[in-house]
Amino acid sequence: MIEQFILDQQLNAMRIAGKKIGAGRSPERTIAVFNPYSGKQIGSVPKATLEEVREAFAIGAAYKPTLTRFERAAILNRAAAISTRRLDEVAALISAEAGLCMKDAIYEAGRVSDVFLFGANEVLKDDGQVFSCDLTHHGKKRRVYTQRSPLLGVITAITPFNHPANQVAHKVVPSVATNNRMVLKPSEKVPFSAILFADILYEAGLPPEMLSVVTGDPREIADELITNPHADLVTFTGGVAIGKYIAGKAGYRRMVLELGGNDPIIVMEDADIDEASTLAVAGSYKNSGQRCTAVKRMLVHHAVADQFVEQVVAKTRAWSFGDPSDKKLDMGTVIDEPAAMFFESRVNEAVAQGAKLLVGNVRRGALYSPTVVDHVRPEMLLVKEETFGPVSPIIRFKDIDEAIRISNGTAYGLSSAVCTNRLDYITRFVSELDVGSVNVREVPGYRLELTPFGGIKDSGLGYKEGVQEAIKSFTNIKTYSLPWA
């Protein structure tokens, strides 16, 4: 039983510099966590006080990490081994608190191990640069060198519900790799995976002062997390509105904001329709459609639209969903019943405005069926705004110019997918789509845990995540020069 596992592992307590804080508080000072499918409470976490949040920052700020590259790599490699050994436990916890099906939860648990391994490998690389100074007529016989150092203060990390473990990994691992200190606040809807993640790192040998996990009500502690004097950088993944609030509140400190997306898959007239429809369906429904890089708009050339729609409908009907603990199913629930109700209302609104519902839009609690809606117009809210669930809205276009115009016609700019074999089309999409990533004949969300990832416009400020890029964001660069004969 997952409830007993949570108690046995003491996941009902925060981790402030490794210490278990806050278990057993009164109901008024705890947050209940529910299984989205059953609706039953599986545990609770404490509501941190402002004093506890400040203590976490003070401990981090006072501690000066001295881990060598070898020691950091060893810790991350041991953490990878532990997380791999405990993969079934990690996956079961993800599924229980987020409602993700076991297929998706197991995949995410494997990704966490990958992040640990990539982080360990990156630690061993020295990315310093060397500049010879005799490059101009007034140059000198000197060389300028660069080196990266940890931030002077503490990193604040705030993570969302949709990837309870992997989002945490992408914040914490680069922090460990760069000898930084971090205070992590996971989503109050899915806190247990983050606490278990911290325990894995402590077991692997991480000095506990380098990582604290605080849980609580954002209305009480969010401003302190953003504005604490010891916070040198705020890294946040989540919705646009909250990201912009952080940007306005944080003041003179660094920010890495990975926000929402409204990612298209664009299917041209020369595309392999079987391949394109398979990618479209997987991109729309994996992780219950709750990914910033999920397919949220299907843009299809009118010449192949009917064939594409037929295949998408057939593959959607075959996409099994239900109890997330059933390892045979392709999809579990969305995060909670209000989210499912929101998706249902968005689809109903589009249908009332002339779109055609082909399959789905069935809701039971937090369970929401894979849904296909055809003849959607770009101005409908279903596709104008981000619909963060398993909905496949189909928009038909006449040529590449219109496809690019529609794709760029929202406030978002995260990722995209294009299905074509024509190089002239590919080069135009790469050049003209206002997004952070363009994947050819692949889903918008495809990436390695190592590669740069992030968006522009309302999807982010252009800073990238991914282990390599986060390491750069989490460090200060210093130059020094020496005489060189």
Segment roles from a protein language model:
Residues 41-48, 61-66, 156-157, 265-267, ...:
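Short, well-ordered beta-strand elements within core beta-sheets of diverse protein domains
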Residues 61-64, 80-87, 91, 98, ...:
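Structural signal for hydrophobic packing residues in well-ordered secondary-structure cores
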Residues 39, 72, 94, 116, ...:
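Residue-level signal for inorganic ion chemistry
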Residues 38-44, 74, 231, 266, ...:
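Conserved C-terminal structural/oligomerization subdomain of aldehyde/semialdehyde dehydrogenase
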Residues 128-275, 397:
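Rossmann-like NAD(P) dinucleotide-binding subdomain of oxidoreductase/dehydrogenase enzymes
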Residues 36, 50-53, 69, 87, ...:
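Residues at or immediately preceding the N-termini of alpha-helices
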Residues 241-377, 400, 440:
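ALDH superfamily catalytic-core signature
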Residues 1-141:
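N-terminal Rossmann-like NAD(P)+-binding subdomain of aldehyde/semialdehyde dehydrogenases
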